[in-house]
From Swiss-Prot:
A motif (BH1) lies at residues 76-95. One of its GO terms (molecular function) is BH domain binding. This is Apoptosis regulator Bcl-2 homolog. Induction: Expressed in the early phase of the viral replicative cycle. Expressed in the late phase of the viral replicative cycle. It comes from the Viruses. It is found in: Host mitochondrion; Host endoplasmic reticulum. GO terms for cellular component: host cell endoplasmic reticulum; host cell mitochondrion. PROSITE patterns: BCL2_FAMILY, BH1, BH2. Keywords: Apoptosis, Early protein, Host endoplasmic reticulum, Host mitochondrion, Host-virus interaction, Inhibition of host apoptosis by viral BCL2-like protein, Late protein, Modulation of host cell apoptosis by virus. It comes from African swine fever virus (strain E-70 MS44) (ASFV). Belongs to the Bcl-2 family. Interacts with host BECN1 (via BH3 homology domain); this interaction allows the virus to inhibit BECN1, and thus autophagy. Interacts with host BID. Interacts with host BAX. Coiled coil: none annotated.
């Protein structure tokens, strides 16, 4: 990797990969950079709010299922708008999915991390850079109020539930040989 690509790789590692590895207990809090320790606070808050709202469960047994479910949910999440709050929801969702895979002992957590990394690189990073990059994300994480966190969590949940409901309906139609 060279120049600009290395900078982008480092941004994604700082914001996304470090938190996911911390969340799934691959690294301790002491191994997080000072920057990662700061953003961990807002991401942990998002995760706690999400826990109070709903239990998210997954049915993931293959690389393709991970890619399909992950891409479906996050594409819906960012369909009409990218903002820092939704990016927080994306990171927490990615961490939750990776933890599910690790806890299920199916050794697919690295697929989640790679899929999340690639989605962020290709779909979110240009927006992030044009909106202040790491510094602005840190500012957002330090100054978010409870209302904006709850609003973003509710929006994320509506997108997640819509996607999962749609997938369930499609599966039901397939099972009944209607499509």
């Amino acid at each position: 990797m060279e120049g600009e690509e290395l900078i982008y790789h480092n941004i994604i590692n700082e914001i996304l990969v470090g938190y996911i590895k911390y969340y799934i207990n691959d690294i301790s809090e002491h191994e997080l950079s000072p920057y990662q320790q700061q953003i961990k606070k807002i991401l942990t808050y998002y995760d706690e709010c999400l826990n109070k709202q709903v239990t998210i469960t997954f049915s993931l047994t293959s690389v393709q299922e991970i890619k399909t479910q992950f891409t479906g949910v996050v594409t819906e999440l960012f369909r009409d708008l990218i903002n820092w709050g939704r990016i927080c929801g994306f990171i927490v969702f990615s961490a939750r999915m990776a933890k599910y895979c690790k806890d299920a002992n199916n050794h697919l957590e690295s697929t989640v991390i790679t899929t999340a990394y690639n989605f962020m690189k290709h779909n979110l990073l240009p927006w992030m850079i044009s909106h202040g990059g790491q510094e602005e994300f840190l500012a957002f994480s330090l100054h978010s109020d409870m209302y904006s966190v709850i609003f973003n969590i509710k929006y994320f949940l509506s997108k997640f539930c819509n996607h999962m409901f749609f997938r369930s309906c499609v599966q039901l139609l397939r099972n009944c040989n209607l499509i």
